Each structure stands twice: as C-alpha cells, then as structure tokens.
C-alpha cells in the first residue's frame, strides 16, 4: 500500500530545489538551474546528484502519475518522474533531448547508471507518465492522452519499506528549462495486467 499520510506534491521535499519555482494547488512550475544532473559513473566516469527532484514519501508499493509540460531546447534537457531510495538506487524517466531529438528516456541506477532511449511518437512537450513499484518490480508507462498507457520499461528494482517519488528535471549542459508538472496522483498499485494499457 501507499502507507503515506501526505500524498500531495505540496507535501513533497525538494532535493536541490531550483532557484526559480512556483508551487500552487496541484501544480509545480520550475526553471532549471545551471548544469544539473542525475548520473552515476557509467561511460562518463562522473557521479552527479544535482538535478531537481520533488520527492513525496510513500510506502513499499504504489502507483504515481503526473503530467509533464516542458520547453526542451538543448542536448540532455530532461523532465519527468523519479523514484528514489538513496543516491545510489533510483530511476528517472521522461523526455530527454538526445542527438537533436526529444526522446523517451529512462535511467535505472543500482550502484551505476544505465540509459535507454526510444523515439516518442506523441507530443514531447505535453505528456503523462505513470510509474508502479510493487514486489521488487518497477513499471513505467507513458501516455499522450491520459487514456492509453503503453509500456516504457519493466525492470527489477530494490525492495524497500518506503520510497520517494515525484517530478524530476535536469539540464546538464545549461540552465533555464521551463517545466510544469500537474495532475499528480499517488495511490496504491493499480494492479493492472502487463498488457492492459488503460
């Protein structure tokens, strides 16, 4: 179960709160600071934990969902959702600029980071993300209309009695990415079959 007293974004805790951020009921609008990122070691050799993350504490199993509206421009501009245990165990997923295109991107970190990208056929400037964690499995889904939710990634994920989950944004090469997060929900796991896209 969610096992959380406070499931609203307003009850979240910032990791690296951006200098420019506005929070109102059910909505967070921010502008990223210079050279912010989440990454651990792989390929590049560096570790960065400077990205913006608004984490809402939850229990051992949950489904979280959020709408993401962003004005991506430069290499590695990214915004989406993050699930985090600590600085060495986390997942971030969303839209990221790579090779001149807005890609559907996910990074799973278990000591070291991996990175997976795919072409996104919807509107990269306005989309929804859903993440479910239950019994050591993490499932990410994306939607362009909040009705159909194809799978982005299914992966093992460390079990924990609690997680932090919420909006994430980074700009490793610059600052100034403007993003609005809204339509946030945090509930018990939806319990849908893997190929149930509703």
Swiss-Prot record:
InterPro entries: ConA-like_dom_sf (IPR013320), DUF1349 (IPR009784), UCP022704 (IPR015987). Induction: By calcium shortage, copper deficiency (via MAC1) and the presence of galactose (via GAL4). Gene3D superfamilies: 2.60.120.200. It holds the Pfam family DUF1349. It comes from the Eukaryota. Its main location: cytoplasm. It is found in: Cytoplasm. GO terms for cellular component: cytoplasm. Keywords: Cytoplasm. Present with 721 molecules/cell in log phase SD medium. Functions in the galactose metabolic pathway via the GAL83 protein and that it may control the level of ENO1. This is Regulation of enolase protein 1. It comes from Saccharomyces cerevisiae (strain ATCC 204508 / S288c).
